Amino acid sequence: GLKVLKYTFTMNFEEIAKKMCAKGKGILAADESTGTIAKRFKSINVENTEKNRLTFRQTLFSSKAMKDYIGGVILFDETIRQKTLIGPTIPDLINKNGAIPGIKVDKGAKPLAGSKEETVTEGLDGLRERLKKYYKLGARFTKWRAVYKIDDNYPSSQCIKSNGHALARYASLVQEANMVPIVEPEVLMDGPHDIDKCYQVTTNVLNECYNELAIHKVNLRGTILKPNMIIPGSLCSKKVSAEEIAKKTLDCLKKNVPNEVPGIAFLSGGQSEIEASKNLNEINKINDTNFLITFSYGRGLQASALKAFGNDQKNSNAVQKAFEHRAKMNGLSSKGEWSEGLEKAAAA
């Protein structure tokens, strides 16, 4: 196993960014905070203890899907420090299975002073020191999430500017520490807005982010963008096809994301597992850019596995089977080779 570690550790951040989004692979978001995983466990009647969190995550990280379909895993502070129940640390286990360990470094979205319904992401204080520690623990990439809600007056330019500035300062510090920053500006799908409103807001958000990244001298070749897809709000009465979602999403990326960015890994943002795979597949079917377009899913990869864990916490086989199926489906989507037929055949 050590050979793998040494190899990863000598790569520079541009090479790591490429490896994380290699064709047919994506990123597993397993960085739920203790509060968020509490909600997930509650829904399956599992007690939210450190041991249960470790058992569930370790089961995913040791699955054979890791080698084939997962390029990187985003961890939470608790998880990157944990020893597995079978010996090595969690980052060692992930490395051994061919993926790159990463860490969420933001401290959460906090109320934005002067705009009480919006948030700004905190976590810059002490970040330089924390990054050194995470590097020693094995992390080679990081994540920071900014959140924008759509409403009549939102997102405000205050929110778009504050979050863009924080994302850029974060990214600059991360590259200084020789790691890859995942830049995640999430325009939420909550609300009744239509797909065109999502397009327009996402355009403004991406523009501001890339302006700030340029000001802060971030090397875009060593970054990954984790954006939302261009989709209608969850309460929008006008439904749209996966084809339209793909067309508008790709168009928005082409117009607003600089060419140097090597990889774009979508968040699933509350889409169902199947929707998330189908939409990603449609985007890749028409992808005529140099971007490697893939997934960075949390629930989009874990929902079925969580259900299996709820049914029987001792049955790691069932949990791994559910996870392997989703990872494989999304691996296919990242190449534009997914189909409903394969979905059903594999699940049978």
Regions found by a protein language model. Name each.
Residues 9-137, 150, 238, 242-248, ...:
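Alpha/beta catalytic barrel-like cores
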Residues 224-230, 341-346:
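A glycine-rich phosphate-binding loop feature that marks nucleotide/adenosyl-phosphate handling sites
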Residues 1-10:
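Short, Lys/Arg-enriched N-terminal segments with co-localized hydrophobic residues
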Residues 108-112, 147-154, 188-192, 232:
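Conserved radical SAM core fold
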Residues 150-161, 193-196, 271-279:
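Active-site-adjacent beta->alpha loops and helix N-cap segments on the catalytic face
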Residues 58-62, 87-95, 100, 119-141, ...:
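Alpha/beta enzyme core
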Residues 49, 144, 183, 225, ...:
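Conserved, mostly hydrophobic/aromatic
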Residues 105, 146, 185-187, 227, ...:
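Short glycine-centered, acidic/aromatic-flanked micro-motifs in structured strand/loop junctions
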